[in-house]
Amino acid sequence: MSRNYNDELQFLEKISKNCWRIKKGFVPNMQVEGVFYVNDALEKLMFEELRNACRGGGVGGFLPAMKQIGNVAALPGIVHRSIGLPDVHSGYGFAIGNMAAFDMNDSEAVVSPGGVGFDINCGVRLLRTNLDESDVQPVKEQLAQAMFDHIPVGVGSKGVIPMNAKDLEEALEMGVDWSLREGYAWAEDKEHCEEYGRMLQADPNKVSARAKKRGLPQLGTLGAGNHYAEIQVVDEIFNEYAAKKMGIDHKGQVCVMIHSGSRGLGHQVATDALVAMEKAMKRDKIIVNDRQLACARIASPEGQDYLKGMAAAGNYAWVNRSSMTFLTRQAFAKVFNTTPDDLDLHVIYDVSHNIAKVEQHVVDGKERTLLVHRKGSTRAFPPHHPLIAVDYQLTGQPVLIGGTMGTCSYVLTGTEQGMTETFGTTCHGAGRALSRAKSRRNLDFQDVLDKLADMGIAIRVASPKLVMEEAPESYKNVTDVVNTCHDAGISKKAIKLRPIAVIKG
């Protein structure tokens, strides 16, 4: 017997200006409560989605995000609560922007590939330069073209960095250390990556031959979809101290943002794991509310195989972003006829938006070892956390939030409050408001390109037909998302960036 919209509302309670609680009973078998963070505009979108679902209008075959947050709260071994961040929108199994942590010492606790996503370690890297907007404007088109020429982009794009099967095995195991050894990265790049750009539990043997075959030609490529490289300028500085630590000292300073993941390799790792886990669930009698939430006990062979394969795909994504950093440095050096070093093209930080990691957190006054699933959400550790780079010990971890094409992006910093409320996690971007198919129906790609040109943004796109899917209209407002996190105290704004050129798959 399905409930109507008003019945559903009985289970939802506003607990603060920016936070709602999802009470047990909203979906069956909830082990813990759910919460989601919103402001007024985002709240309206969340409730509209629920209302439509009650009328029988599903979201492209996915449950509404609120229901998905509830279903995650019903997974075995979950602790504290299932958390939806302001950019949450429905996805495969877990909503994108839903994070959850599972107790490693609970033998029932599970790992779920749907809680990481298909694009494993999809993430963002930000580079700074010592250039000013006035240096770049006259050569903006040239620079966009140079980046487009250097970085292979698009759906089936192939890498320019030479790589054979043995190289791939090593890259899967070593992450950024491989890039460093091969001369595609600077030593200090590594310091400024989450996990130092290498997940140690990676095992290339847990990545199938099919996944490797998909991954081999794609290294150092941008891919299509919401992946992009953007030349940006600093538009606003909210926290001068944090900005200085990141090497940002004035408005108009030029940066480059690279947004990419593990391409076909990560997708295949996830697909392979879901197949293996369906069988494991039958064997271990694991019941879930939604079959997209296929999972396995963390300690089971399937659970361990997935975590080792996921870590390898994560390393692949870090190598991928390192390769694109190398190509970006070359493109800039060529246009400005100098060296990347002289342009001060340093990595500010590199974060992952889709990953599961073992971390220590205090829950109900006790330190516990948890497997933290972050899907469409970003680690945001506070000042003095042992896992963040020395340079950022006093500011908290930099958190990179990519806006959508042609809108602004942000750099935030992690907070102590986020550590207690959300396991040191905050939003990751704008979050879709329209499905990809709807975006294609409602928007014309030429309009989208014209609009960017009107805003003075140089654009290079490999597949123009895919542009509508990524048009700003398809997304929630990134400023709403970032401000909600800021007001809720789970991360703080440091820098706002606006694009002047965008390169896209």
From Swiss-Prot:
<keyword id="KW-0597">Phosphoprotein</keyword>
<dbReference type="GO" id="GO:0005829">
    <property type="term" value="C:cytosol"/>
</dbReference>
<dbReference type="InterPro" id="IPR001233">
    <property type="entry name" value="RtcB"/>
</dbReference>
<keyword id="KW-0436">Ligase</keyword>
<feature type="binding site">
    <location>
        <begin position="428"/>
        <end position="431"/>
    </location>
    <ligand>
        <name>GMP</name>
    </ligand>
</feature>
<feature type="active site" description="GMP-histidine intermediate">
    <location>
        <position position="428"/>
    </location>
</feature>
<dbReference type="GO" id="GO:0003972">
    <property type="term" value="F:RNA ligase (ATP) activity"/>
</dbReference>
<feature type="modified residue" description="Phosphoserine">
    <location>
        <position position="300"/>
    </location>
</feature>
<dbReference type="GO" id="GO:0072669">
    <property type="term" value="C:tRNA-splicing ligase complex"/>
</dbReference>
<feature type="binding site">
    <location>
        <position position="122"/>
    </location>
    <ligand>
        <name>Mn(2+) 1</name>
    </ligand>
</feature>
<keyword id="KW-0832">Ubl conjugation</keyword>
<dbReference type="GO" id="GO:0017166">
    <property type="term" value="F:vinculin binding"/>
</dbReference>
<feature type="binding site">
    <location>
        <position position="409"/>
    </location>
    <ligand>
        <name>GMP</name>
    </ligand>
</feature>
<feature type="binding site">
    <location>
        <begin position="353"/>
        <end position="354"/>
    </location>
    <ligand>
        <name>GMP</name>
    </ligand>
</feature>
<feature type="binding site">
    <location>
        <position position="259"/>
    </location>
    <ligand>
        <name>Mn(2+) 2</name>
    </ligand>
</feature>
<dbReference type="GO" id="GO:0005737">
    <property type="term" value="C:cytoplasm"/>
</dbReference>
<dbReference type="InterPro" id="IPR036025">
    <property type="entry name" value="RtcB-like_sf"/>
</dbReference>
<comment type="subunit">
    <text>Catalytic component of the tRNA-splicing ligase complex.</text>
</comment>
<keyword id="KW-0547">Nucleotide-binding</keyword>
<keyword id="KW-0963">Cytoplasm</keyword>
<feature type="binding site">
    <location>
        <position position="504"/>
    </location>
    <ligand>
        <name>GMP</name>
    </ligand>
</feature>
<dbReference type="GO" id="GO:0005634">
    <property type="term" value="C:nucleus"/>
</dbReference>
<feature type="binding site">
    <location>
        <position position="122"/>
    </location>
    <ligand>
        <name>Mn(2+) 2</name>
    </ligand>
</feature>
<dbReference type="GO" id="GO:0046872">
    <property type="term" value="F:metal ion binding"/>
</dbReference>
<dbReference type="Pfam" id="PF01139">
    <property type="entry name" value="RtcB"/>
</dbReference>
<keyword id="KW-0539">Nucleus</keyword>
<dbReference type="GO" id="GO:0006388">
    <property type="term" value="P:tRNA splicing, via endonucleolytic cleavage and ligation"/>
</dbReference>
<feature type="cross-link" description="Glycyl lysine isopeptide (Lys-Gly) (interchain with G-Cter in SUMO2)">
    <location>
        <position position="496"/>
    </location>
</feature>
<dbReference type="GO" id="GO:0005525">
    <property type="term" value="F:GTP binding"/>
</dbReference>
<feature type="binding site">
    <location>
        <position position="227"/>
    </location>
    <ligand>
        <name>Mn(2+) 1</name>
    </ligand>
</feature>
<dbReference type="InterPro" id="IPR027513">
    <property type="entry name" value="RtcB_euk"/>
</dbReference>
<comment type="function">
    <text>Catalytic subunit of the tRNA-splicing ligase complex that acts by directly joining spliced tRNA halves to mature-sized tRNAs by incorporating the precursor-derived splice junction phosphate into the mature tRNA as a canonical 3',5'-phosphodiester. May act as an RNA ligase with broad substrate specificity, and may function toward other RNAs.</text>
</comment>
<protein>
    <recommendedName>
        <fullName>RNA-splicing ligase RtcB homolog</fullName>
        <ecNumber>6.5.1.8</ecNumber>
    </recommendedName>
</protein>
<keyword id="KW-0819">tRNA processing</keyword>
<feature type="binding site">
    <location>
        <begin position="402"/>
        <end position="405"/>
    </location>
    <ligand>
        <name>GMP</name>
    </ligand>
</feature>
<keyword id="KW-1017">Isopeptide bond</keyword>
<feature type="binding site">
    <location>
        <position position="353"/>
    </location>
    <ligand>
        <name>Mn(2+) 2</name>
    </ligand>
</feature>
<keyword id="KW-0342">GTP-binding</keyword>
<dbReference type="GO" id="GO:0170057">
    <property type="term" value="F:RNA ligase (GTP) activity"/>
</dbReference>
<keyword id="KW-0464">Manganese</keyword>
<dbReference type="GO" id="GO:0005654">
    <property type="term" value="C:nucleoplasm"/>
</dbReference>
<feature type="binding site">
    <location>
        <begin position="226"/>
        <end position="230"/>
    </location>
    <ligand>
        <name>GMP</name>
    </ligand>
</feature>
